[in-house]
Amino acid sequence: MSQSSLNMPGSHDPVALEAMRVRLQGRRRFKNAIALTMSLAAMAFGLVWLIWILYTTLRLGVGGLSIELFTQSTPPPNTDGGGLANAIVGSLMLVGLATFIGTPIGILAGVYLAEYGQKGWLASITRFINDILLSAPSIVVGLFVYALVVAKMGHFSGWAGVFALALLQIPIVIRTTENMLKLVPNALREAAFALGTPKWKMVLSITLKASVAGIVTGVLLGVARIAGETAPLLFTALSNQFFSMNMGQPVANLPVTIYKFAMSPFAQWQSLAWAGVFLITLAVLGLNILARTIFSNK
């Protein structure tokens, strides 16, 4: 203790020390209260809009639900009846095929980055491109596929939509797969190598098996991402008013149908649009909850 502090008046006075302690605690409590209040206000601000959106979707979407919604195709303008059967089936086809194509590519690329490439130049380039695709707006991907596929073919098609959606899903699967594989302890790899296990078998039987829950979570999050994408489909698959499973032609889908019906002046189309919004919201929420449940259980 310095001489100046020894000579300070009241430096050994218990009452003065207690008063100083109380003042310091009061300042800390005040700062903590301000920080906590601001945090709660920010959380409430976000939750209010989320709850409002969900409430509006539920209130307006449930009213449009009916058996005809799942059994009839989209109706002509200014007519009663009709449904979204063709758009629902079209969306399932587009998302399913995009997932079928994008999932194995994303997993294989993630395995390469985590187990083989690591710090090589090819891995660095792959990660850089993957980061760009992760942050790129979906409309940019749609325009890219339009110029690459639709303009060359001379017409819109379901396959172009599948290609665009797969490009949006692949980066998510790559990032998730790489991160999950990196979480596997190196001791497991070293133990497998010590037993003479080839690297490909070690990856297949140990690291992939240990991280399968995280990879499945990434795939489900990728599906949830592309399920409601509208912009890329406007430039690729477009839509139609009929029930068609011909992927070489424009394919009806929920996002574009919702966009078209919501912008129309017809009450029946607007009701179907809200019903479609409710279905997509329900599907995306369900996929996110399922992904979190699978990951937390593992």
Where are these regions (language model features)?
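Amphipathic cytosolic juxtamembrane alpha-helices at the membrane-cytosol interface
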Residues: Q118-A123, R127, P185, R189-T217
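Transmembrane-helix boundary motif in ABC transporter permease subunits
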Residues: A98-N130, L143, A291-S296
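Periplasmic/extracellular loop-to-transmembrane helix junction in inner-membrane transport proteins
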Residues: E18-A41, Y55-A98, K119, T257-S271
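Transmembrane alpha-helices
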Residues: T99, T176-T177, K199-F235
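Generic hydrophobic transmembrane alpha-helix motif, especially the helices
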Residues: N130-Q169
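Interhelical loop and adjacent transmembrane-helix boundary motif
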Residues: P77-N78, L233-T281
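C-terminal transmembrane helix and the adjacent membrane-cytosol boundary/short C-terminal tail
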Residues: L113, E178, K182, F193, ...
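Transmembrane alpha-helical segments of polytopic membrane transport and secretion proteins
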Residues: M1-F45, A291-K298
